[in-house]
Amino acid sequence: MHAQDKGGILPALSLLLIAVAMVSPSQAAYKLQERYSWNQLDFAFPSARLKEQALASGDYIPTNALPVGVEHFGNRLFVTVPRWRDGIPATLTYINMDHSVTGSPELIPYPDWRANTAGDCANSITTAYRIKVDECGRLWVLDTGTVGIGNTTTNPCPYAINIFDLATDTRIRRYELPAADTNPNTFIANIAVDIGKSCDDAFAYFADELGYGLISYSWELNKSWRFSAHSYFFPDPLRGDFNVAGINFQWGEEGIFGMSLTPIRSDGYRTLYFSPLASHRQFAVSTRILRDETRTEDSYHDFVALDERGPNAHTTSRVMSDDGVELFNLIDQNAVGCWHSSMPYSPQSHGIVDRDDVGLVFPADIKIDENKNVWVLSDRMPVFLLSDLDYSDTNFRIYTAPLATLIENTVCDLRNNAYGPPNTVSIPKQAAPGHSAVGPPLYTTTNQYRPVLSQKPQTSWGPSLPSRNYLPALNGNPGIPGSRNNLNNLGAPGQVVSSVSVSTNTVGPSGIEVPKAYVFNQHNGLNYETSGPHLFPTLQPAPSQLGGGLKTYVNARQSGWWHHQQQG
């Protein structure tokens, strides 16, 4: 993540930090179960004496460490810690899950301490962000070679992909990105790995967030190339405003970031979905294009633009299962969302699988392992970057749950007739002359997109907030709070829950707060399914005012109260 003080944020933090809404048990969803948590990170030093020396010398500063990436393989859970500040002893680490079933375990450097030496370019990893384990038992780690963040960034080493054999814990390849694949603004934090017909038929794709490009790397050729001449890699100028944990900030320059890959399609290729961070929109391209070095300059029309996900829909991490379910973080909403790739990419086809205004503040990374278990890491990143975390509180959490449990009774669960496409209508993909269309025909459904109104956030974290207990039984145990037998705690299928701060909401005549972003999108022509008053159920009791649902509500922007809010 690239971040810096955006003039005026820091002076206001004493008022803004405050932050997330206090939630009662009836407001929190608990499909994801907490596995590990930390107030601050700790590392497994070889001895207590060496740890004390590192603390005394400043080589280890516990409050400077922030986890950003997670990946699971076998009995190990990998966690990455970028060197954004001084005192980070290791950037690529893991938890031995046999020794630490839960709790706040020490992070063990992977594969060892020497391989985590900052600045030892050829032999070590300086800074790692997101990582990926492939189906061949290899761990792919992109070393950015950077120390610091924003204006403090230095580049002691070049960008390099490191691949480890997890059976032997040895590095089997290191490949430096050539100068032609980067530019002075390059910042790469995300990686997607594409395995084709064999383990040698492997590609990795890197999203250049600030240099606005997409880089392909071929394992077989040991060669890379860059796609850079595409406007889809750039941020949306209307989507650079963020609200996380009550903090309003701007990341308006953040381009292509989150990526996911579909299962292999009938033509032998996958589809890569991606989205800029400062955007609510998703884009797609076939890996047939990305795997072809000759297409870097003439592939503009092979990229496809999809609809917006809906309001408050910034995302940094996404992953797709082998049966086509995409999960992604919704950082403005303290939530994890879903979309089934067999459905149209429209707001009404998106759902919320879990939301927690305390535990899921900035769910930084999401992964699905080979057993279809989902892993989510949350880290309160904006608070860490723009202010100071409260290290007497739990700041970092890793959650897990079976994928089937997460999507059950959501719009993404096609096994449930209530949420499947009861009357599917095949719609051939449309493409202008010379354009390519990606994927199979789409279909429409009668499901509705149901954003809901949010209550005012409180002004403290609140020590009495409910906490998730670690529960080892994750397969639909009736005793799990908020699981299969407590679905009333979950958002309605397809609904998107707003968690924006008070200062960014619009207040209607009933005194209920409505996300301003939703009004803004409607005002600027972004349409949703709006039939029926069920869309804004809290407005139904006053038919004379706004009881006609969202259409009536949106029409209210012509009234005096709406204009007053806009002028104020």
Curated annotation (Swiss-Prot):
Q: Give the record's keywords alphabetically.
A: Developmental protein, Glycoprotein, Secreted, Signal
Signal peptide segment: 1-28
Q: Which GO cellular component terms, listed alphabetically, does the Swiss-Prot or TrEMBL entry include?
A: extracellular region
Instruction: Write down the glycosylated positions.
Output: 151, 222
Q: Where are the transmembrane segments?
A: none
Q: Describe the effect of residue 451 to S.
A: In strain: 200RIB/A1, 201RIB/A1, 203RIB/A1, 233RIB/A1, 332RIB/A1, 340RIB/A1, 358RIB/A1, 394RIB/A1, 441RIB/A1 and 417RIB/A1
Which compartments does it reside in?
Answer: Secreted
| Keyword Secreted in annotation | yes
Q: Which family does it belong to?
A: Belongs to the major royal jelly protein family.
Its function?
A: Controls the pigmentation pattern of the adult cuticle and larval mouth parts.
Protein name, entry field? Protein yellow
